[in-house]
C-alpha cells in the first residue's frame, strides 16, 4: 500500500475516534500545539531556511519567497491564531434548528464534523498550522499535501504537531502529511472518494483549476484573488490614497491584495496623476488602458491578460471608466469573486455596487486586506472560498462541519 492510500485509510479510522472527543480535549490539544510551536521555533526556522535557500537557488520570485518565509513573529502569529481558535465556540454538537411535528416527532438539526479533510496547497507553511488546528477543533482528521518548495518546513511543523499531540488524548495521526510531493501523489488524492470527505485546494489559479477539473472528491474551492478597488467620483482623496496604498503595497503577495484599480474619469482628472506618482514612489509598476496612458506616459499599456491576472507582486492594473455601471461590468468580467471594494460618498452607488458585484466579500471605504479569518474574528482560517455552495468567504469553524438530523419519537410509525 502506497503512502497516500495508507494515510487515507488511517485518517478514516482516526475520524471515527475524533468525533467522540470533547471540546475540552480538543482545546487541550490545540494549546499543546501552540506551546510546542514556540518551544521548537528554532528547529522550525532552521528547516524553513533550507526551503528558502533552495528557493533562491531555483530563482523563486520575491513574492513566492515571502509566502514561503517563516520568522519568529510569523510563528508567534500562528500561535495567537490558535489561542483565538481555542476561545471560539466549538460548533460540533450545536443544534442548528429544532421543531416538533404534529405526530409528536421531535426533530433536531445538529452540526457534525465533515470527517476527513484533504488539504492541497502551495508554498505557505503557515497553512500547515492553520489547516491542522482548525480541523482538530472541528473534530476532523486532516491529510496535508503541501508543495515541494515548502517540504522541509511542512515536515518540521507536522513533526512538532505530532510531539504536541503525543502529550494529549488526540491521536498523533489526526494530522498527517503526504511527504511525496510528485504530481502522482496529488492525482491520487484527487480520487480518494473512499477516504476523503472533502478536498480543499489553497494556492494559485493553476492549482485550484487543476483540482476543480480533475478531482472526483467533493471540492471546497478557494479562489485566486484578482481583487479590485473602484474609486467613485465622490471618493475622498486621502481615504482613496490610503486604502489603495495599503491594499496594494502592505503585502502584495497575498490573495486579498488588490490587482486593479478602477477609477471614475472625473475623480482621475483631479487626483489620478498624484495617485500614480504616489504608487510609483513605492515601487509599484502600473499597467493601464489608453486613458490612463494619456494621463501618465510612464504607465505600461495593459494587455487583455493583465485584467484577469493575480500579479501577487508590486504590479497594478489601472482602468478608467465613465460610470459605476461600467466599473461593475469590468469587475464582474475579470474579478475572481474574492474581494471587491468601492470608495464613495454616494450611498445609492454603494448600494448598487453591493447588489450587483459578485464576490465573497464586498467593502465600502475599507481595504480588501481585511478578508481574512482572524480579521473577521474566526481565528485561524482554512482558506477563502469563492464558490457559492456550502460556504463562501473566509472559512472558519462552521465551514468544516456538516449537519445531520436527530429524530426522537415514542413509537411513531408512518401511515
From Swiss-Prot:
This is Gamma-glutamyl phosphate reductase. Pathway: Amino-acid biosynthesis; L-proline biosynthesis; L-glutamate 5-semialdehyde from L-glutamate: step 2/2. It is an enzyme of class 1 (oxidoreductase). Its EC number is 1.2.1.41. GO terms for molecular function: glutamate-5-semialdehyde dehydrogenase activity; NADP binding. Its main location: cytoplasm. It comes from the Bacteria. It comes from Bacillus cereus (strain AH820). Belongs to the gamma-glutamyl phosphate reductase family. Keywords: Amino-acid biosynthesis, Cytoplasm, NADP, Oxidoreductase, Proline biosynthesis. HAMAP family: ProA. Catalyzes the NADPH-dependent reduction of L-glutamate 5-phosphate into L-glutamate 5-semialdehyde and phosphate. The product spontaneously undergoes cyclization to form 1-pyrroline-5-carboxylate. It catalyses: L-glutamate 5-semialdehyde + phosphate + NADP(+) = L-glutamyl 5-phosphate + NADPH + H(+). InterPro entries: Ald_DH/histidinol_DH (IPR016161), Ald_DH_C (IPR016163), Ald_DH_N (IPR016162), Aldehyde_DH_dom (IPR015590), G-glutamylP_reductase_CS (IPR020593), Glu-5-SA_DH (IPR012134), GPR_dom (IPR000965). It is found in: Cytoplasm. One of its GO terms (biological process) is L-proline biosynthetic process. The gene is proA. GO terms for cellular component: cytoplasm. Coiled coil: none annotated. PROSITE patterns: PROA. The keyword Oxidoreductase applies.
